[in-house]
Amino acid sequence: MKKSICLFIGILFLLLSVSANDAYTKVSGGSILPLSKTKNENIKMEKEEINFTLYKDHYDINVKFYFKNYGPTETIEVGFPQWKHLQPTEDDFYYFKSKVNDVTTNFTVKELEKSEPLDEGMVITKWYIRSVTFESNEITTTEVEYSAPYGVYGISESADYLFGTGATWKDCIDEMIIKIMNTTDDVWINAIRIDNSDLGNIIRENNTIVIQKKNVYPKIESEIFLELEIGR
């Protein structure tokens, strides 16, 4: 009962403002992008499914991307960024997995000697890299899964996901589905923020919140931010 009430409260305050100075993300991830760092004008992200699973002492994220190649078949290196806010921390993912077309794939981890600036107060510290073949006029799926410690937001805690790196593909993200599942009565969702934008269609089912958005044009720093209160 306590958890359901808190989910309801979270929906009431979904548009709470968050600033980079208040938030301290220890480690998080983001949408995959072509490592050329230039916008790919042929391959479009048709859909992105982002699944948060909240536990008492950490959270898991599983993300599935659906791409369609409107140009000729091509194989490119794509990178999944690991990022944080500018704070003295050595935190890392507890684990990381990846798939292409539902098949588990190997990846290369690129440790950065010097962090790459992403935006004011945000830096990329590591890349998870793999080669993906995008067949012409076909849908290619890629999937990542990782586990991370909660970040800090004032006296509260936070969970984050950076979807702004999805801006490096053709046009907009046609559809974005965000699913937040709370597994414990020890975690309360106080607020959800998605890049100062309208949250689209919201569905609440028991201990799960589902948000559906269409035609998303992210900025490179666009993120999903959950403000949480955790009982100790």
Which residues make up each language-model segment?
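Lumenal/extracellular ectodomains and adaptor appendage modules
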Residues: S19-R232
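Positively charged n-region of N-terminal signal peptides that target proteins for export
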Residues: M1-S4
